[in-house]
C-alpha cells in the first residue's frame, strides 16, 4: 500500500513539473529527415527538439545539413499559441526538396523583424500561402524567396513593408511567377533593391509606379533578365542617393520604351550594362546628360535604339547617355517633326547629323535639332 502511494505521489510530481515547465517553440526532424515539424509546448527534451533561432549565415539551423532531404514542413496546432518568434531567417533555406508547407497560418509573425533567406532556394515549391503574414515589424526581407524557381503564384499584396530596409534579391530567380502584386509596398525606408526582381523571367507586368525610392542606394540588377516585361513605369523613381545602377535593365528584351527622365544620376558610379541586350528597346526618354565612372557596355545589344543618333554597336558607353548626340529622346514632344528648310533651325539651336556630326546648318533629310529628330524637306 505504501509503495503504491509513493508511486502515485511520484507520478503526480512528474505531472506537476511538466505543467510548471515553460512552454517554448522548437522543431523536430523525422527519423528519415523528410519532415520538419514545429511545436510550442513543454516537451522539447522528450521529443529531441531543436532551437528555432534566431539564425544567421554564421549560425545556421540545426537541421541545415539535412535540409536537402526535407520534403514537408508541418506547423503543429500548438504553434498557434506562440507569440515569441522574432526571426524566421534561414528557416527553410536550401530546402530544395520541399514541396509542402502545412499549417503555415499557425505561424504568428507579429513580432518578427527578420525574414531574410526564409524560403531561399526552395526550388521544388509550386505554391506558398503567406497572405496572412503580419510583417509590420520586419526590417529585412532580403533573399526571402530567391531561387523559388517553380513557384507559380505568390500573394504578397498585403505585406506591410513600412519598416523594411533591405529588399535585395527578395524575388530573384522566381522564374515561373507570371504575376506579382507589389503595388501597395511602402518602400520609404528601403536602402537596397539590388537584384530585387532579377530573373523574374515570366513576369509580363510589374507595377512599381508607387515605389518611394528616396533612400535607395543600390539598384544593381534590379530588373535584370525580366525577359517578358512589356512595360515598366519608373518615371517617379527618386534616385538621388543611388550609387549603383549597373545592369539595372539588362536583358529586358520585351521593353520597347523606357522613361528615366526623373533619374538623378549625380551620385551613380556604376552604369555598366545598364540597358544591355534590351533588344526591342527603341526609345529611352531622358532630357539630361549622364556621366559615370563605369559605363562599359551600357547600351550594348540595343540595335533598335534611336535617340538623337541612330544606334552604333561601337558606341555603347555613357558618352551616348544624352539627348543631343546620344541615344536619349527628350520628353514632351514628337519623336520626328517635319519642317521646311527655312524654319528648320530655331534660335540658333545646335544641329547634328544622325551620326552625331555637328552641322553648321540643317541639311535635307533627318537632322537632330535641339535634341529632336527633324526632317527637313
Positions of the model-derived regions?
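Residue-level detector of functionally pivotal "anchor" positions at catalytic/ligand-binding pockets or at interdomain
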Residues: 331-355
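Short beta-strand elements of solenoid repeat domains
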Residues: 93-94, 117-121, 143-147, 168-173, ...
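C-terminal tail/sorting-segment detector
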Residues: 3-4, 366-377
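Extracellular Ig-like/FN3 beta-sandwich strand-entry sites
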Residues: 362-364
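Structural signature of tandem-repeat unit edges
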Residues: 69-83, 97-113, 123-139, 149-165, ...
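N-terminal capping/linker segments that flank leucine-rich repeat
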Residues: 2-94, 99-108, 210, 285-334
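Short strand-coil-strand connectors
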Residues: 32, 355, 369-372
